[in-house]
């Protein structure tokens, strides 16, 4: 409900001042209701002011101003919500189709919006939600004078359905076959990555290219894991299309360039079931691991029920196989498993052993499995490759280890030299744990390590809900001249961590290609006394992105 808390019209005459207060009906207007001409004029002026300075967006009274969600009001004061707000805050599954249709799912509610319903503002799509707030589990209060909107959840946050299958929403790519190679990790990573663009866009990415161009010194038989995939994607090595580098021939083209750029990925630890389901529902398939007591071509195991395509392992072996979780069923009968777990419920998983395995390549894994979803990754933001012109980095191998000062806070910095006249557009880094608060700074006139103290300027801040890889866009223009040295600094506070800085470092044989000569990084506890990262045989995981002038 819209409340106009104070409208004061002051008319100055020769001897009198007349003050006008809003009528009761003006205080209790409903958004979109008809109004008289004078009141409508007042509202339009308020809406114009809000459009210029932005809406103060709150959830249960807490401001979201630091998160950058661009919710808008149309000329009837009805809410227009972008995809990131619908997913992150309202906990909807947002599916966009090639014909322009958008489907919103929340709990058991499914809403369809045609292309004519959607507003496109500054190349961003907005969904009109005012008429559907009750169906989506929210009440909203309005304060147009202050330009404030407060969302109040009224369904207890119960937004997940009891069962969800991405196959039923056109959100999976075809099942593939890894054959005899140890490339399940790459199939799982790319299967998860492919799903986040569906149903709008179907792409099949090259497993060979990821497996053979990731910077790590492992061959196709030695396996891998999600940090390798993340490093490959974050460093713009890929992805590339399968058609340009086909699987299984043992050859690759290292000169291919990425057809998409990864901006964000989140990591969920410790099988937090609601968070796993939420990530699948809102973003797409998740890459995770389990122990498979069978291998490709041999689908016999005491833990696998062929008749029901279900798997449950209750032993102590560590994970040895990666796959993609694409859904769940809370009521999946425990009797379908061999042996029988203590509870109903299963994740729906996409494997990489071809369609002859399971139910055309899919199978059910019990919630009670010893390893499933103990660590999971979901790719949440993928853009076209022209989002930035240039990348500056010294951590091709990405997050190999962590360092810090036995405290949950730290500063870290990287120094770069502009290769041409450019504009700084964004920075990226890893949050090594959930609920990380961060601030981003720049030093544009870097001379030596002392510059990290005196000349830094804050250019961003925020908080991450999950561990993961994050890109922070910079809203102000920071111009760099060719040959100019500049430093990016990030401060983090990661609750419960003693080493909150992600670093590239020696990780054994797989990191034999580690290069510590390509960076100039520094670390500090409070941002006052700095230490060289390279002198500790590490590179700081902190990238910068620029556009050419």
Give a label for each model feature.
Residues 1-11, 20:
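N-terminal Sec-pathway targeting helices
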Residues 19-160:
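Primary recognition of N-terminal secretory signal peptides and signal-anchoring hydrophobic helices
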Residues 21-22, 26, 155-425, 430-466, ...:
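Catalytic-core signature of thiol
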Residues 85-86, 131-134, 427, 486-492:
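Extracytoplasmic/surface-exposed domains of secreted proteins
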Residues 107, 150-155, 381-383, 445, ...:
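Short beta-strand-to-coil "C-cap" segments at the C-terminal boundary of structured domains/repeats
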Residues 120-122, 133, 281, 342, ...:
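Surface-exposed coil/turn segments at beta-strand junctions on protein surfaces, enriched
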Residues 435-516:
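Aromatic- and Gly/Pro-enriched, solvent-exposed loop/edge beta-strand patches characteristic
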Residues 491-549:
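Short, surface-exposed beta-strand/loop patches at domain edges
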């Amino acid at each position: 409900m819209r409340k106009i808390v104070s409208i004061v019209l002051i008319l100055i005459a020769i001897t009198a001042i007349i003050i006008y207060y809003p009528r009761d009906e003006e205080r209790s207007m409903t958004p979109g209701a008809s109004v008289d001409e004078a009141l409508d004029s007042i509202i339009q002026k308020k809406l114009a002011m809000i459009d210029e300075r932005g809406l103060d967006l709150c959830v249960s009274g807490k401001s979201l101003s630091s998160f950058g969600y661009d919710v808008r009001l149309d000329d009837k004061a009805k809410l227009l919500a972008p995809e990131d707000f619908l997913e992150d805050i309202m906990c909807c599954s947002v599916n966009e189709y090639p014909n322009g249709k958008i489907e919103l799912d929340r709990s058991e509610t499914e809403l369809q919006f045609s292309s004519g319903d959607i507003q496109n503002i500054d190349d961003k799509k907005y969904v009109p939600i005012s008429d559907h707030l009750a169906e989506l589990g929210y009440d909203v209060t309005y304060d147009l004078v202050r330009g404030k909107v407060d969302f109040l959840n009224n369904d207890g946050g119960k937004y997940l359905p009891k069962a969800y299958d991405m196959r039923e929403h056109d959100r999976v790519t075809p099942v593939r076959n890894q054959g005899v190679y140890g490339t399940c990790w790459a199939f799982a990573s790319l299967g998860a990555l492919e799903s986040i663009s569906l149903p709008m866009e179907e792409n099949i990415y090259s497993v060979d290219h990821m497996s053979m161009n990731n910077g790590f010194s492992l061959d196709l038989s030695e396996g891998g894991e999600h940090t390798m995939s993340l490093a490959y994607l974050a460093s713009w090595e890929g992805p590339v299309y399968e058609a340009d580098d086909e699987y299984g021939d043992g050859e690759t083209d290292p000169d291919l360039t990425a057809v998409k750029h990864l901006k964000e990925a989140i990591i969920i630890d410790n099988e937090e079931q609601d968070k796993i389901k939420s990530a699948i529902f809102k973003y797409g398939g998740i890459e995770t691991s389990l122990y498979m007591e069978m291998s490709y071509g041999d689908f016999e195991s005491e833990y696998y029920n062929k008749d029901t395509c279900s798997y449950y392992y209750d032993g102590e072996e560590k994970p040895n196989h990666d796959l993609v979780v694409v859904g769940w069923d809370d009521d999946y009968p425990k009797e379908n498993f061999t042996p029988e777990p203590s509870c109903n419920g299963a994740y729906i998983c996409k494997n990489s052993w071809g369609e002859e395995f399971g139910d055309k390549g899919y199978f059910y894994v019990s919630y009670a499995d010893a390893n499933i979803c103990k660590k999971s990754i979901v790719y949440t933001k993928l853009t076209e490759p022209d989002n930035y012109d240039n990348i500056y980095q010294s951590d091709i191998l990405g997050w190999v280890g962590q360092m810090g000062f036995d405290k949950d806070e730290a500063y870290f910095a990287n120094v770069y030299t502009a290769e041409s006249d450019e504009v700084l557009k964004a920075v990226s880094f890893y949050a090594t744990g959930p609920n990380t608060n961060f601030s981003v700074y720049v030093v544009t006139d870097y001379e030596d390590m002392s510059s990290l103290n005196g000349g830094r300027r804050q250019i961003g801040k925020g908080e991450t809900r999950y561990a993961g890889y994050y890109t922070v866009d910079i809203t102000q223009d920071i111009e760099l001249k060719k040959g100019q040295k500049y430093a990016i600094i990030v401060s983090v506070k990661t609750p419960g961590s003693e080493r909150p800085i992600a670093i590239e470092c020696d990780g054994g044989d797989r990191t034999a290609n580690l290069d510590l000569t390509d960076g100039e990084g520094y670390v500090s506890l409070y941002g006052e006394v700095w230490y060289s990262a390279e002198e500790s045989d590490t590179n700081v995981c902190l990238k910068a992105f620029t556009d050419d002038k």
